[in-house]
Amino acid sequence: MIKDQHHNVAGDGHDDHAQKPPFHATIITVFPEMFPGPLGLSTTGRALGRVWSLDTVDVKGFVTGPFGRVDDSPFGGGAGMVLRPDVVGQALDTGGGFQGRPCYYLSPRGQRFTQAHAVSLAKGNGVVLLCGRYEGLDQRVLDHYNIAEISMGDYVLSGGEIAAMAMLDACVRLLPGVMGNDDSGTEESFSAPLLEYPHYTRPAEWKGMDVPKVLRSGHHAAIKAWRKEQAERITRDRRPDLWEIYTSGTRPDCFVKDD
C-alpha cells in the first residue's frame, strides 16, 4: 500500500487545510527533506505561507514491492541509474496534480532559464518542478506528461533540487509584497540586456575609498545617468554577448516581459 507522500512545507502557520496563497509550488523529489532549505530564510522565507506556498512529493513513497526501488539500470547499458517511469509516474498522478500550473523537469539539456521565465511564472498561479537524480529520468515520463525541460546553466549538478531552489527564488522574489521595494526587481541585472550598476552604502569613506560624489549629490538625473553609464561599461567589459544585444536594439525572448 502506498502512503500519502504529499507534504506541505510549513510557513507562518500554514497547514494542510489552510487556503493556499495565490502562488503555489510543488516539488517532486527523492529528497523532500531538502526543502524549504534557503527558501525558508530571508525575503522568500518571510513570504512563505503568506504570499506563496510550497509542498513536496516524495518519489520514494511510490515504490512498490519488498525490493522496490526508485531507479534501475539503463537499457542499452551505460553508467549510472535511471529513475523508473512507473514510480515517478505514480508520484505525478497522485501528488496533487498540476492544477493548471506549468511543470518543468530540471535538466542540463533543457532550455536555459532566464529572467523572462521568472517574470512569466511569477504572473501565474505557481509551478510544479520535477527534480532528477542519478543518471536522469526515463524519457517516457517527459513524453507522456508533456513536461518541458529547463536548465539553470551549462553545468551538471548531483540533482535538480538546488536548481529548483534557484528557480523558485527567482520567481518568488518577483511576487507582489515579497521585496520591500517593488522597483528592485526591475532595476536588476537581466531585467534588461544590461548588467547591474555598482551599489554603495555607508560609511561614505572606507579603507581610503570614497563613494562616488554623484551618488551623494542628490541630483537624481545625474545619478540615473551615472548608473546607466556604469551598467553599460560593465556589460561591455564582462558580457560581450549581452552588449551586442543591447547595442543592436533588439530584445530577444530572454528579455521580453509579458504586459
Language-model segments: which ranges?
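N-terminal nucleotide/polyanion-binding subdomain common to many enzyme families
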Residues: 1-95, 220-244
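Fold-independent oxyanion-binding glycine-rich loops
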Residues: 30, 59, 106-109, 131-134, ...
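Structured adenosyl-cofactor binding patch, chiefly the S-adenosyl-L-methionine
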Residues: 137, 141-190
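Hydrophobic/aromatic beta-strand patches that form the interior of the parallel beta-sheet core
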Residues: 26-28, 55-57, 102-104, 127-129, ...
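Short, solvent-exposed amphipathic alpha-helical segments in soluble enzyme
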Residues: 42-47, 119-123, 144-146
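Long, charged alpha-helical interface segments
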Residues: 190-248, 252
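Oxyanion-binding "anion nests"
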Residues: 251-259
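S-adenosyl-L-methionine/SAH cofactor-binding core of RNA-modifying enzymes
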Residues: 83-133, 138-139
